[in-house]
């Protein structure tokens, strides 16, 4: 199975433990793009809605495309009652959007799974003139707030982290958007903070695609070790987050 499809195997855990983005980020995005009733928005790969509520609640005409059938079903369960909610279960790379065009397209950490040329060229085509492409991700630092605990956690990684499918993402260059015709590229940072108890931390780690594919006997020993080391070292893990928002725009005359 492709790593980008692994998340679909844990829809309930993914919904409960994947982090959300800062309210300040969404307010900036909504104001910047003028998202309101009458605007048409596409979210690429919403998962189970980690970045959906603030946009959907503007009253815009919200559309989403989700690759995972179980994640798609969870989205339908959570948001199906909204009259402005529309979602399809398909692969953005191959999906035919026909004549649909959008005022904004956004993606929360999903666009990195799409080849850069496809991601930028296809979103550019799907945007109306002047339309906004927004891309967001979270960078988390749990070393600085928990240095001793961090060192002990790394020993568990050294011993048990042996995923069957290596994680090879990270090469997507958000700042390459202008090479595909986009203009006004911007980057904005919004701080955040999370605290997790041992069980929450283990459940959160269990939503990482490369952690899901750790085989036994390593997997159980790894997660039990994480739970034990956190419980014995203060009982919590602190994350200092930086929510990153990349913005760019299709020219008005294209």
Task: Identify the meaning behind each predicted range.
Residues 109-110, 137:
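Short catalytic micro-motifs in class I SAM-dependent methyltransferases
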Residues 113-123:
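A short, conserved alpha-helix within the catalytic core of class I
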Residues 38-39, 100:
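Nucleotide donor/acceptor-binding cores
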Residues 1-36:
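Conserved class I S-adenosyl-L-methionine
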Residues 48, 165-166, 170-254:
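Conserved Class I S-adenosyl-L-methionine
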Residues 40-42, 48-95:
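Class I SAM-dependent methyltransferase SAM/SAH-binding core
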Residues 95-105:
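A short acidic, Gly/Pro-enriched loop at the edge of an enzyme's catalytic core
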Residues 121-124, 128-193:
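Conserved catalytic/acceptor-binding region of the Class I
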């Amino acid at each position: 199975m492709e790593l980008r499809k692994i998340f679909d195997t844990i829809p309930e855990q993914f919904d409960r433990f994947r982090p959300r983005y800062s309210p300040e980020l969404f307010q900036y995005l909504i104001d910047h793009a003028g998202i309101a009733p009458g605007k048409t928005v596409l979210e690429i790969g919403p998962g189970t809605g980690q970045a959906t509520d603030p946009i959907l609640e503007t009253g815009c005409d919200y559309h989403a495309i989700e690759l995972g059938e179980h994640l798609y079903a969870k989205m339908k369960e959570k948001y199906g009652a909204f009259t402005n909610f529309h979602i399809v279960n398909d692969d953005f790379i191959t999906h035919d959007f026909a004549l649909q065009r959008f005022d904004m397209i956004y993606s929360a950490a999903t666009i990195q799974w799409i080849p850069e040329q496809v991601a930028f060229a296809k979103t550019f085509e799907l945007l109306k003139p002047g339309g906004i492409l927004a891309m967001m991700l979270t960078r988390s630092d749990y070393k600085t707030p928990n240095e001793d605990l961090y060192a002990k956690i790394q020993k568990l990684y050294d011993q048990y982290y042996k995923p069957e499918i290596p994680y090879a993402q990270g090469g997507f260059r958000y700042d390459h958007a202008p090479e595909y015709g986009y203009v006004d590229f911007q980057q904005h940072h919004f701080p955040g903070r999370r605290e997790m108890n041992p069980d929450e931390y283990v459940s959160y780690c269990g939503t990482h695609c490369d952690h899901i594919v750790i085989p036994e006997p390593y997997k159980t020993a790894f997660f039990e070790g994480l739970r034990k080391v956190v419980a014995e070292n203060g009982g919590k893990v602190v994350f200092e987050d930086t929510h990153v928002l990349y913005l760019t725009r299709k020219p008005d005359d294209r």
